[in-house]
Design a protein with these regions (language model features):
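Short amphipathic beta-strand starts and helix->beta connectors
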Residues: 26-35, 78-90, 120-123, 160-169, ...
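Short, conserved active-site entrance elements at the starts or edges of catalytic domains
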Residues: 205, 211-236
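Glycine-rich, small/acidic residue-mixed loop/short-helix segments
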Residues: 4-8, 233-241, 255-344
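Short glycine-/aliphatic-rich beta-strand segments at the starts of folded cytosolic domains
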Residues: 41-62, 128-145, 262-273
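Acidic, proline/glycine-enriched N-terminal capping motif
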Residues: 1-77, 81-82, 86-88
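Acidic, low-complexity central loop/insert segments
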Residues: 38-39, 46-47, 92-215
């Protein structure tokens, strides 16, 4: 436990056994809160930090987006891929005065840190797990900006820009109605309480995950590592791939996918009926693929009606046909929902 998780527990949050999730109410109430403005402790995410004069060069040579051109007040979606172009990690990367930091799924953080450390060699960069000193808070909804101001943040003027207040509270604008706060652990509780006092409802992990699903912003977790090329997760559509930078692990596959042939899989937003037993990595089936998997669920979140919404990587032909089932060829049938952006 940390000062941050202790504060959440005293506020009435129920923490998961591994302290990687939190809830403030039952699943239905939490899902309903996502229709308003919410403040969420992002315990399912963790922060890594890269510090040193070679931070930009080091990361630029390893990830899918352009780190060298990331401004001091910038943030970007990014990914680290296997040599076969499959995503090992997806994350939000931002600049810091002495290097960079990134937020990724906590369940892959230790292994990912070890993997990255293998590439350091003579680079003047130090990698560290920053979870002990940095807490992440998500704000989403129509009054998210007001909640961020209430928490003591300075508002960025554009999407994927960031500001830092005097108390060290970093505010990254993901969209006009969606912000990520990175706060020192010692003051995160006060920032969270202030955001709630400014009109946000304290909500749990599932509420944020539902908001991310509705925003079409996927997250690689342990269950989906090395399953997808970046474009299958719509990563170039949300600004997570730069096709003009130099080489990085998997770059040839990512580029070939972009410029040669037709992309056969995309990420879709889907609805699952109540009672469906499924999670990240669950296989999807469609008549045009028979007993063979036609896709996988990526992220899943409960909804207020007892069902679920999810992001799913799916064969485009199967999505167009419209008959896709979860977990087995005769499993529950899912339905397609709109994404907030077009699938190019």
């Amino acid at each position: 436990m940390t000062a941050w998780t202790d504060h959440l527990a005293h506020r009435g949050a129920t923490l998961g056994d591994d302290a990687r999730s939190a809830s403030f109410a039952d699943a239905t109430t939490e899902a309903r809160s996502a229709d308003g403005t919410i403040a969420v402790p992002l315990l399912h995410l963790g922060t890594l930090r890269a510090v040193g004069p070679d931070s930009a060069e080091f990361l630029h040579n390893l990830v899918s987006n352009d780190v060298k051109k990331l401004p001091a007040d910038g943030a970007e979606w990014n990914s680290f891929n296997s040599p076969k172009g499959r995503m090992i990690a997806s994350f939000l990367l931002w600049s810091e005065p002495e290097g960079h930091a990134f937020a990724l799924s906590a369940d892959i953080l230790p292994a990912f840190l070890k993997k990255l450390s293998m590439y350091v060699l003579r680079s003047k960069v130090k990698l560290s797990d920053a979870r002990a000193d940095t807490a992440l808070i998500g704000l989403a909804g129509p009054d998210a900006a007001a909640a961020a101001l209430g928490a003591g943040a300075l508002l960025p003027e554009a999407d994927m820009k960031q500001t830092v207040a005097d108390a060290g509270l970093r505010c990254i604008r993901l969209s006009p109605t969606r912000y990520l706060l990175a706060a020192p652990v010692a003051t995160a509780g006060a920032a969270f309480d202030a955001a709630c006092a400014a009109g946000a409802t304290a909500a749990g992990t599932a509420a944020w995950q539902l908001d991310m699903v509705r925003a079409g912003l996927p997250l690689i977790t342990a269950a989906t590592q090395e399953e997808f090329v970046a474009q299958m997760l719509n990563y170039e559509l949300i600004g997570g791939v730069n096709f003009h930078k130099g080489c990085y692990p998997g770059q040839e596959i990512v580029a070939r996918t972009q410029y040669l042939g037709k992309l056969k899989k995309r990420t879709y937003r889907v609805a699952l009926p109540a009672g469906t037993e499924a999670g990240p990595g669950t296989d999807l089936y469609a008549p045009d693929f028979g007993e063979q998997s036609a896709g996988k669920l990526v992220n899943v979140a409960p909804t207020a009606d007892g069902g679920f919404e999810a992001l799913a990587v799916l064969q485009c032909s199967s999505a167009e046909a419209g008959e896709v089932r979860v977990g087995a060829p005769d499993g529950p049938r899912l339905s397609l929902l709109d994404l907030p952006y077009a699938l190019a």
